[in-house]
């Protein structure tokens, strides 16, 4: 039986429409897969999707390990021209150099640093949540190539040769690569089935009390100490909060234990381990350490100092300042190197 012409035309149109719908579905599915990929978190147990992630991927995350034997030179200066390493901590007044300045204005920053007098305290960022800025030789180190790593190595060497008081700063628990490769050491997110919580910088956070975390931080601090740094500041020394953060321990107790164990691991009579904390009421370990505070207005300096439990706040309390306001000068203060006029 022959199919009528009109029926054939109708079937042809239906077939064309069906094919178009199939193509549209496949295209939409492909676009969805590409879009959702940015929200996937990989764990040891598989992958999960978290739509609360910030889709912005930090620039400069490309990383590679250094060539063996070409890492930072380890230097011990015990001569008469060495930096003052007496057992007594002194009140600090100096400058700090952020990652942004190292990345965007390196030559100007280097010139300013090398114009400073001997023993001036200078703090530089040596690592971020996405890798090391200098050529670390640690087995777990991932180098962040968003800055000139060789230039950072040379800057550290030049600062040491000029006998500045060298301070290294890096985030204590914010570490994407270590968290990715050591999931049990990371802080999980609520309802994630073991997947790790990730912050707006797309970094995982480590548990302060975890033995792997403490061992990892100890190795970094010891490497920096061996490179000639007089002090290391553990930045962001706190536990993140929020409904998505599944942290079951007591943050204050765990941070206190972590600080004490780290100081015990790296302590010498001339090396200082310090902590940037979220509250001035945090109790520091006994020994050579300082408390650093960010974003404190000059008008609140005295009130903030009164909230600490420090026996010598003028020495053990350091404010990170972006102004020349003299109200900071009663205590330790590090000002951005931007405030230093070029010669």
Language model: regions and residue ranges:
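Hydrophobic membrane-insertion alpha-helices, especially the h-region
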Residues: 15-33
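N-terminal Lys/Arg-rich, disordered targeting/topogenic segments
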Residues: 1-14
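Active-site-adjacent "subsite" loops/lids of carbohydrate-active enzymes
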Residues: 83-100, 173-222
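Glycine-rich, aromatic-flanked loop segments that form ligand/cofactor-binding clefts
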Residues: 121-123, 147, 151-197
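Substrate-binding cleft of secreted/luminal carbohydrate-active enzymes
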Residues: 32-40, 46, 50, 288-343
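Catalytic domains of carbohydrate-active enzymes, especially glycoside hydrolases
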Residues: 107-132, 223-235, 288-292
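Aromatic-lined carbohydrate-recognition surfaces of secreted/lumenal glycan-active proteins
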Residues: 96, 165-175, 233-235, 252-295, ...
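Aromatic-lined substrate-binding rim segments of carbohydrate-active enzymes
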Residues: 75-79, 128-171, 241-270
């Amino acid at each position: 039986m022959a199919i009528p012409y009109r029926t054939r035309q109708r079937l042809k149109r239906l077939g064309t429409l069906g094919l178009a719908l199939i193509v549209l579905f496949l295209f939409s599915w492909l676009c969805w897969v590409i879009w959702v990929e940015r929200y996937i978190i990989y764990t040891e147990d598989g992958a999960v999707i978290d739509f609360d992630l910030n889709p912005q991927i930090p620039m400069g995350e490309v990383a590679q390990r250094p060539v063996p034997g070409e890492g930072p030179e380890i230097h011990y200066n015990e001569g008469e021209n060495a930096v003052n390493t007496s057992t007594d901590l002194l009140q600090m007044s100096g400058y700090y150099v952020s990652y942004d300045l190292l990345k965007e204005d390196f030559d100007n920053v280097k010139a300013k640093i090398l114009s400073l007098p001997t023993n001036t305290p200078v703090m530089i960022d040596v690592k971020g949540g996405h890798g090391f800025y200098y050529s670390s030789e640690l087995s777990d180190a991932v180098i962040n190539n968003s800055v000139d790593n060789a230039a950072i190595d040379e800057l550290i060497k030049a600062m040491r040769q000029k006998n500045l008081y060298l301070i290294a700063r890096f985030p204590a628990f914010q570490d994407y690569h270590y968290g990715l490769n050591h999931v049990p050491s990371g802080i999980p997110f609520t309802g994630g089935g073991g997947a790790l919580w990730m912050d707006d910088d797309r970094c995982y956070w480590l548990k302060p009390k975890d033995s792997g975390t403490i061992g990892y931080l100890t190795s970094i601090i010891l490497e920096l100490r061996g490179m000639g740094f007089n002090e290391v500041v553990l930045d962001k020394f706190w536990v993140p909060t929020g409904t998505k953060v599944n942290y079951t321990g007591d943050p204050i107790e765990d941070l206190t234990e972590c600080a004490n164990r780290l100081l015990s691991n790296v302590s010498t009579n001339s090396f200082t381990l310090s902590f940037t904390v979220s509250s001035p009421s945090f109790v520091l370990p006994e020994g050579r350490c300082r408390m650093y505070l960010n974003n404190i207005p000059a008008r609140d300096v005295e009130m903030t100092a009164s909230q600490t439990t420090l026996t010598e706040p003028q020495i053990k309390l350091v404010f990170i300042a972006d102004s020349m306001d003299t109200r900071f000068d009663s205590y330790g203060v590090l000002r951005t190197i931007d405030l230093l006029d070029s010669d």
